[in-house]
Regions:
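Family-specific signature for flavin-dependent thymidylate synthase
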Residues: 1-211
Length: 211
């Protein structure tokens, strides 16, 4: 998993403060905007935060990408397994963490699997991944279309996507997906996004008490 900045609105916070003062044109050029943005966050004036945008590149798995793509206020561009060979992103499919199913919460897992059980299944999973990649490449080598061959690949197959959204969308996404109830791997992505958000929107981050 990795997350990195691709682009952000120049002077993003200054831009949001400028449009927030649309009804006070004599004060629009005021360079002091920390209190203004803090006030807007505190009192849920979220439309202001729809005026600046950020695009991040996210390296993850097909399984987690499906969760991310459910956030429909963003726009996306994802690596196409129909157009390109999946091995362009990775020659092998990386191992993932194994956790026990929480019997009281179907959307939660607990990290207390017996090490010997974990080792047993990791061996089987690695074999399964290797066989899947061999089968996939064999299908491509035999002239079978990528759009057909991709269906034999596991959800753990690496993917890359670009995620673009307003400051408001990023605040909502990070707040939701860094909280309890989110799958650990998705939470790790949200935390990485949060780190970049704090760097690019420091005034907002402070008002949100993220720093």
């Amino acid at each position: 998993m990795s997350v990195k900045l691709v682009s952000v609105t120049p002077d993003a916070e200054k831009m949001m403060a400028y449009v927030a003062r649309v009804s006070n044109p004599n004060n629009q050029e005021n360079p002091n905007y920390a209190k203004l943005l803090g006030y807007c966050i505190k009192h849920n004036h979220w439309s202001v935060f729809e005026q600046s945008f950020m695009t991040l590149e996210i390296e993850t798995t097909r399984g987690l990408a499906a969760q991310i793509l459910r956030h429909r206020s963003f726009t996306y561009q994802e690596f196409s397994q129909r157009y390109a060979d999946s091995s362009m992103l990775a020659d092998t499919i990386p191992m993932f963490d194994l956790r026990r199913q929480d019997t009281k919460n179907r959307q939660n897992s607990i990290d207390d699997i017996d090490p010997f059980v974990k080792q047993e299944f990791e061996i089987k999973i690695r074999r399964h991944f290797d066989e899947a990649m061999v089968l996939y490449q064999s299908m491509l080598d035999s002239g079978i279309a990528k759009e057909c061959s991709r269906f034999v690949l596991p959800l753990a197959t690496p993917t890359r996507l670009y995620m673009s959204g307003s400051c408001r969308s990023w605040i909502h996404y990070i707040t939701l997906r860094s909280a309890n109830g989110t799958q650990k791997e998705h939470m790790d992505i949200a935390e990485a996004c949060k780190k970049i958000f704090v760097e690019q929107f420091p005034t907002c981050a402070e008002a949100l008490e993220w720093v």
